[in-house]
Amino acid sequence: EDGRGGYAKLASVAKTFKKKTKRNIRSLLIHAGDAYSPSLLSGLDKGKSTVDMLNAVGVDYMVLGNHEWDFGPKITRERVWQSNFTVLASNVVDSEGLPVDGTVRTAMEIVGPFRVGIMGLVTPNVKEVSSPETDQFLPVMDTAKKLAKELKSQGAHLIVAIGHLDFVEDMEIIQSGLVDVLLSGQDHYHIFFDNGKDVWMDAGEDAEKVGVLDVHMKSYMKRGKKRFSWETDMRYVDTKHIKEDTVIASKVKSYEDLLGKELDVKIGETLSELDSRKKTVRTEEAAIGNLIIDAMREGVKAEIGITNGGGIRAKKIYDPGTKISRRDILSELPFGNVVVKLGLTGSQIWEALENGVSQVEQNSGRFPQVSGISFTWNPKAEVGSRVVSVDYKGRPLSKY
């Protein structure tokens, strides 16, 4: 977006730092999850091309994110085994209590005389927002406490958690003091925190800005004992003016050419502006949300329709007169979700809408785009009591 981000620019930034690698300097490229989905191409090949690109870029470590289960646990495992880098999912186990096949619980990096312990933590709400089936997600804090102890017993001087966690879960990790460094994803914020004891960094999304964290470690003698200390420098590399890596750019183009043959087919035209930016579809009624859920409702001949704004993904503004293509449709709706028609009571509809507006402050993807009904809500009210009214066919819909 705006000339920022993408694999080719990420590769250029990564190469700059990896050139500095030697015995006492280790440069690692870390991905905080949500790689396999959603994207235009992953909707067609279930993330295979994404892992191919991550391998080419030179990722060293990745934690699984909630979208890694979008195509089911079998595909999750296929993509993990396809990876040429270490994949962590420290608090995830299968139905038999074993780690997800191909992942590791912890890792240890040796940097000169120092040992850096690494864990990867996944938000437990995967079971609500994706398709993990029988995979289980253990409590984040319990896992962090257990693994921090294990890593220290293995001689770790510094403990790093790569987290694909909600903001509140990130805060709990930092406040606990269990880890020294938290590198997080999921919320897509730019976070830059260092209180002298713990460091927390989040680099947003899509490599628009690449987070760079330099950790300087040293040992010294004090009162006859060997001590260890560390300090950090944090910054972001804005990729807007970064030159693309030519090899990776060529690889990206080959995938884009493949897509173009199938998707650059015009299927319609918009007569009014459509806004699919995240801040719009996740916080308010949006024309594009109305259009999408109207089509879903018409497709199954339902009386009303509700879809979550977080399923609308392209983050674009379509000016009036824009020709709409297959590419646009798949960019906006990459998940391959199924439209379900079912009977609901008035109270169940109210409950669904309450759930939809319960996490607007966190920019959650559950905000309801609706068809066939209208509702008003108060964002300042207590969660669970925010919906003020619901109308169906011009009449109030009973809450009871």
Please name every model-derived segment:
Residues E1-E244, S254, V281-A295, G305, ...:
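Acidic, metal/ion-coordinating pockets
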Residues K243-I324, Q362:
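Hard-cation-handling environments
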Residues L165-V168, R235-K261, I373-K399:
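Amphipathic, soluble alpha/beta structural segments
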Residues D2-K9, N84-N91, S95-E96, T103, ...:
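Feature captures C-terminal
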Residues K22, I174, D202, K253, ...:
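Generic hydrophobic alpha-helical membrane-segment signal
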